[in-house]
Amino acid sequence: MDRKKYIGNDTLCLAESIEADNEILYESWNEHETIWGYNWQIPYSFDEYSAKFKNDSNSDIWSWGAVIMRLEDNAVIGRIGLSAGLPDLTITIFKTHRNQQYGTMAFLLGVRYCFEVLRLDKIHAGCFEDNTASRKMIERCGFKRNPEGDETENHIFTGEDRLQLDFVIENPCRPK
């Protein structure tokens, strides 16, 4: 099935999520590292997820979302989304594709899409203070710390307080 491609480079593209992606996306949301990184566990069965929790613009949770596709083989290697409300860009790279710079490439594509196509003035991104890899990726993509946006959450597994760091990037093409 052909899918809409939102934006890409020589290695990856961000493309629309299709029904065939539901299984791998659902599995990703149930992966321990993803739950730990988002501090959230999906409360839906697979059927409920397939019916209502799609990472696309038809969702009340996401204002935009896409799968991350590797162009050499069209493999879906992750997901990226912009949350509804506060424009917060989120990403998950599936476990077998981590530590290969795909996250940075895809996040940069997501930032470009948000600024060039969605025409946003600024975007937020966040990670927990113990997530060094995500923090480095966010900073490599040009985001700056925004301590006013930091939030403390109870850890999903331990119940302890956990600080989520906020970062922001402004559209360089928008008037200040």
Positions of predicted regions on the chain:
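Conserved GNAT-fold acetyl-CoA-binding loop/helix
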Residues: 33-54
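Acidic, low-complexity intrinsically disordered regions
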Residues: 25, 32, 36, 58-60
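Acyl-donor (CoA/ACP) binding surface of acyl/acetyltransferases
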Residues: 1-32, 65-176
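A short helix-loop-beta-strand connector motif used in the catalytic cores of GNAT acetyltransferases and
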Residues: 54-67
